[in-house]
Swiss-Prot record:
Domain GH18: 26-301
Sequence similarity: Belongs to the glycosyl hydrolase 18 family. Chitinase class II subfamily.
Any GO BP: chitin catabolic process
Cystines in this chain: 45-92, 75-82, 187-216
Functional summary from the UniProt entry: Defense against chitin containing fungal pathogens.
Active site: 152
EC number: 3.2.1.14
UniProt cross-references to InterPro entries, sorted A to Z: Cts1-like, Glyco_hydro18_cat, Glyco_hydro_18_chit_AS, Glycoside_hydrolase_SF, Glycosyl_Hydrlase18_Chitinase
UniProt protein name: Acidic endochitinase
Gene name of the encoded protein: CHIT3
Source organism: Vitis vinifera
Catalytic reactions on record: Random endo-hydrolysis of N-acetyl-beta-D-glucosaminide (1->4)-beta-linkages in chitin and chitodextrins
């Protein structure tokens, strides 16, 4: 009897090995708007480094307040000086880069007093930054791709109502394109402030801030807390893509900066195995300009 070639176990072993080594490609998200020395939005997107840009911040809204956007030294919205940002938004979108308005931030005055208040804020965001036709659009007539929740202050209530209001089908049908929802929670799980919103499962991208929180950040050569926290977030939150949010330089945050060579050699090879891996988020464009961090990591992201 002829001997049957024993190739099947080898093929299975190779298949298992390939599965274990699967690595997903990602992109870099950047926050722009909080330093007048970081270049224009067009210049930011022309670098070719970024796949997502969050314009930061609409930091006053809700609870009956007149909403206000703060773009630091870039322009003065009080005199309609920020409408020219529309040119940059369109230039970025023409390059395939998604541009979101980030609401909240680490300083400001924002809260939601009720579900009706959340609906009113959603209407304002729609009419002034998304598909609506308000005559008072602070960033001009360009239509942004979505809204980023960077909720770091105040009450935990009604952020889920805001997410649902922004996601309602009538909004999206009206303009025939998707409204992206993104979020930047702090890494302690669950983040108590936007946690109710994240639990809706409506968010497309979640860029968790893995810094300024020692229990869940990189520290002194130790990646354990960081990677354990990453695994908890990616296994618990339903989103299209999970991003590792990092400071772009040691000056960008008090704690949690990861040297580029450590990120590319010890951390990215691990987190890129997750099917939910979306890439890396950096704070911010100004600090990235100073450090060249995105250039150092882009080919590995």
């Amino acid at each position: 009897m002829a001997r049957t070639p024993q190739s099947t176990p080898l093929l299975i072993s190779l298949s298992v090995l390939a599965l274990l080594q699967t690595s997903y490609a990602g992109g870099i998200a950047i926050y722009w708007g909080q330093n007048g020395n970081e270049g224009t939005l067009t210049q930011t997107c022309n670098t070719g480094k970024y796949s997502y840009v969050n314009i930061a911040f609409l930091n006053k809204f809700g609870n009956g307040q007149t909403p206000e956007i703060n773009l630091a030294g870039h322009c003065n919205p009080a005199s309609n000086g920020c409408t020219s940002v529309s040119t940059g938004i369109r230039n970025c979108q023409n390059r395939g880069i998604k541009v979101m308005l980030s609401i909240g931030g680490g300083a400001g005055s924002y809260s939601l007093s009720s579900s009706n208040d959340a609906q009113n804020v959603a209407n304002y965001l729609w009419n002034n930054f998304l598909g609506g036709q308000s005559s008072s659009r602070p960033l001009g007539d360009a239509v942004l791709d979505g809204i980023d929740f960077d909720i770091e202050l105040g009450s935990t209530l009604h952020w889920d109502d805001l997410a649902r209001a922004l996601s309602r089908i009538e909004f999206q049908q009206e303009r025939g394109r998707k409204v992206y929802l993104t979020a930047a929670p702090q890494c302690p799980f669950p983040d108590k402030v936007p946690g109710t919103a994240l639990n809706t499962g409506l968010f497309d991208y979640v860029w968790v801030q893995f810094y300024n929180n020692p229990p869940c950040q990189y520290s002194s050569g130790n990646t354990n807390n960081l990677l354990n926290s990453w695994n908890r977030w990616t296994s618990s939150i339903n989103s299209t893509g999970s991003f590792m949010g990092l400071p772009a330089s040691s000056a960008a945050a008090g704690r949690g900066f990861i040297p580029a060579n450590v990120l590319t050699s010890q951390i990215l090879p691990v987190i890129k195995r997750s099917p939910k891996y979306g890439g890396v988020m950096l704070w911010s464009k100004y600090y990235d300009d100073q450090s060249g961090y995105s250039s150092s990591i882009k080919s590995s992201v």
